[in-house]
Amino acid sequence: MMIWKRHLTLAELNATSQNTMVAHLGIVYTRLGDDVLEAEMPVDSRTHQPFGLLHGGASAALAETLGSMAGFLLTRDGQCVVGTELNATHHRPVSQGKVRGVCQPLHLGRQSQSWEIVVFDEQGRRCCTCRLGTAVIG
């Protein structure tokens, strides 16, 4: 069963990223399912740390991007969602290619939400697990 209250296409979701950090990092929404939102991000000079690996902050940015947009899709007119807490556990390095973030709800309350975002490499291996808490305002 679809949980989203706002009904946007992937093209509309991606258009919201124009001229933002999301676009600068190359993050692209790729799937909007009944209760899941996915995006891809390149692992290249924009997202590397100085030693040629995916920067943990880039993984966190992907996670917060997904969780915040998922939270927004659950709001009604006059409401917004803001992040309150982000936790990231890094499991394995990635040096090139793309990573895919998969965002699903853990808790959906009237005033707060919790999201799990798992980042996978191109071989489908879990690279990072994040949890984002959000507050619903309005």
From Swiss-Prot:
The keyword Cytoplasm applies. InterPro entries: HotDog_dom_sf, PAAI_dom, Thioesterase_EntH, Thioestr_dom. The keyword Cytoplasm applies. The active site is at E64. Pathway: Siderophore biosynthesis; enterobactin biosynthesis. One of its GO terms (molecular function) is 1,4-dihydroxy-2-naphthoyl-CoA thioesterase activity. One of its GO terms (biological process) is enterobactin biosynthetic process. Keywords: Cytoplasm, Hydrolase. It is found in: Cytoplasm. One of its GO terms (cellular component) is cytosol. It holds the Pfam family 4HBT. Its main location: cytoplasm. Its EC number is 3.1.2.-. HAMAP family: Thioesterase_EntH (MF_00907). Required for optimal enterobactin synthesis. Acts as a proofreading enzyme that prevents EntB misacylation by hydrolyzing the thioester bound existing between EntB and wrongly charged molecules. Homotetramer. Dimer of dimers. Interacts specifically with the aryl carrier protein (ArCP) domain of EntB. Belongs to the thioesterase PaaI family. PANTHER family: 1,4-DIHYDROXY-2-NAPHTHOYL-COA THIOESTERASE 1, PROOFREADING THIOESTERASE ENTH. This is Proofreading thioesterase EntH. It comes from Citrobacter rodentium (strain ICC168) (Citrobacter freundii biotype 4280). The gene is entH.
